[in-house]
């Protein structure tokens, strides 16, 4: 299918809608997927804090820090490292008793009751673990009927939907009994390769995604984060799960990691967001890119969470991002590059990378400096975003200034490397009133409780 439109976003959307109407796309489009309420709150993930050396004691230490600093987190994700594995292969569906000596159920109870964290989730791989299931482990010996041995010797979830579902339902039912509320399912793009010479890749992906989602919806009401699965055979075979990681990992020690991260996210999202709400991944609040990372997550339209090490969460970085009760304000789409930069490498072109999103009649636009060690200049016009009106009230977040922007006018931009500008655009009603959000938040344009003011009273 080929679509023609006045902007690339409309053309891409038209293609997906047409594909759905022709039954070429057999899974739900974005509007048919329900965003889990869990991820309307602020979260913390163990990954960049502990990597595979995660333990319950270390997690309690981090939660003590959040408590002392008055930071409310709504959900906690225990990432890779909590399970029993050997040689990158899964031994059991149960937690590692050395790392979680009190047991997973007692751990989740303590996290919820003593620390006030409402939801706890865990990570697991699509194949069981990175290299599948261990042949000498309790899991395989007891439940061989749920698995499939490939011609190359991998032990993976069964090659039929029924067998794969039996495995994941067993695992997820156990996790649910321990108080787990959601899962992150990782390494999805590589999974179908394990079934080479047995099933076509797209068929294998469809079987696996259908089976795992059937279990997730049975046990967790659909609350999951899909991860490492941006191949189209993954995106187009997930029946109805809502959230999918939109980029490679956040790498805190990569010298210019933010460039790669933002470019992947805002250029992939125009396609990915046709099916899924996009997860822009975690970040650190104590980091040279903390502010730009927080702004990007605030306007991303997806989950907002950090992975700070113990002692390293900077509460002041979270104040414009998270409400005191741990809520976040989400825009309705995934954040995307502005249309005139759709085919531009902003880092090499030495211009600000402009990113937009919307909430109802409001827009948000951020301009990021992503050319190393250089200050870059550019401009923003209303024509840079699709379907904008002729006039808006604009709030410049970092200078705390309100002004009017009309069609044909421009905002001059000048951004340093690892810095950004942020503008909220408010629709002006016929009676010259404007519904404005709380200007102390990056996502003010998505404030669920805006106040109505007269234009003359704010300019």
What are these regions (language model features)?
Residues 50-54, 83-86, 127-133, 190-194, ...:
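Flexible loop/turn segments at secondary-structure boundaries
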Residues 133-177, 210-315, 336-337, 345:
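Glycan-recognition surfaces
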Residues 37-199:
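Aromatic-lined carbohydrate-binding/catalytic grooves of carbohydrate-active enzymes
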Residues 297-300, 305, 343-390, 418, ...:
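Carbohydrate-binding surface patches
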Residues 1-30, 35:
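Extended acidic/polar, glycine-enriched regions
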Residues 409-413, 421:
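Short strand-edge motifs at loop-to-beta-strand transitions and within beta-strands
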Residues 186, 391-408:
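Solvent-exposed beta-strand/loop surfaces of large extracellular or lumenal domains
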Residues 104-114, 203-224:
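Alpha-helix-loop-beta-strand connector modules within alpha/beta enzyme cores
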């Amino acid at each position: 299918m080929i679509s023609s439109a006045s902007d690339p976003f409309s053309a891409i959307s038209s293609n997906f809608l047409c594909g759905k109407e022709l039954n070429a796309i057999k899974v739900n489009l974005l509007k048919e997927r329900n965003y889990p309420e869990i991820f309307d709150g602020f979260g913390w993930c163990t990954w960049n804090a502990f990597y595979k050396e995660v333990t319950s004691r270390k997690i309690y230490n981090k939660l003590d820090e959040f408590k002392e600093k008055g930071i409310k987190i709504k959900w906690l994700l225990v990432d890779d490292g909590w399970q029993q594995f050997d040689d990158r292969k899964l031994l059991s569906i149960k937690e590692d008793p050395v790392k979680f000596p009190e047991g997973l159920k007692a751990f989740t109870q303590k996290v919820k009751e003593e620390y006030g964290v409402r939801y706890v989730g865990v990570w697991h791989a699509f194949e069981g673990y990175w290299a599948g299931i261990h042949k000498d482990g309790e899991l395989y010996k007891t439940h061989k009927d749920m698995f499939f041995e490939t011609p190359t010797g991998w032990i993976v979830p069964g090659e039929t939907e029924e067998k794969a579902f039996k495995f994941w339902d067993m695992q997820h039912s156990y996790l649910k009994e321990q108080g787990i509320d959601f899962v992150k399912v990782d390494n999805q793009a590589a999974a179908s390769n394990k079934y080479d010479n047995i099933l076509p890749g797209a068929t294998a992906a469809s079987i696996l995604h259908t089976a795992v989602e059937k279990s997730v919806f049975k046990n967790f009401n659909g609350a999951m984060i899909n991860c490492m699965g941006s191949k189209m055979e993954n995106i187009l075979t997930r029946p109805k799960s809502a959230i999918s990681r939109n980029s490679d990992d956040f790498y805190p020690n990569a010298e210019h990691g933010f460039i790669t991260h933002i470019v992947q996210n805002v250029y992939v999202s125009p396609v990915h967001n046709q099916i899924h709400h996009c997860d822009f991944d975690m970040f650190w609040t104590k980091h040279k890119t903390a502010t730009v990372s927080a702004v990007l997550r605030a306007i991303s339209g997806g989950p907002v969470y950090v992975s700070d090490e113990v002692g390293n969460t900077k509460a002041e970085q979270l104040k414009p991002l998270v409400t005191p009760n741990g809520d976040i304000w989400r825009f309705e789409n995934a954040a995307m590059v502005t249309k005139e930069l759709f085919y531009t490498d902003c880092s090499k072109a030495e211009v600000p990378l402009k990113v937009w999103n919307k909430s109802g009649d409001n827009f948000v636009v951020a301009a990021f400096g992503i050319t190393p060690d250089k200050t870059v200049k550019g401009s923003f016009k209303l024509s840079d975003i699709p379907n904008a009106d002729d006039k808006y009230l604009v709030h410049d977040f970092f200078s705390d200034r309100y002004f009017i922007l009309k069609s044909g006018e421009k905002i001059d931009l000048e951004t340093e490397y690892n810095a950004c500008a942020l503008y909220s655009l408010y629709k002006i009603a016929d009676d010259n009133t404007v519904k404005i959000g709380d200007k102390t938040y990056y996502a003010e344009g998505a404030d669920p409780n805006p106040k109505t003011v007269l234009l003359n009273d704010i300019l």
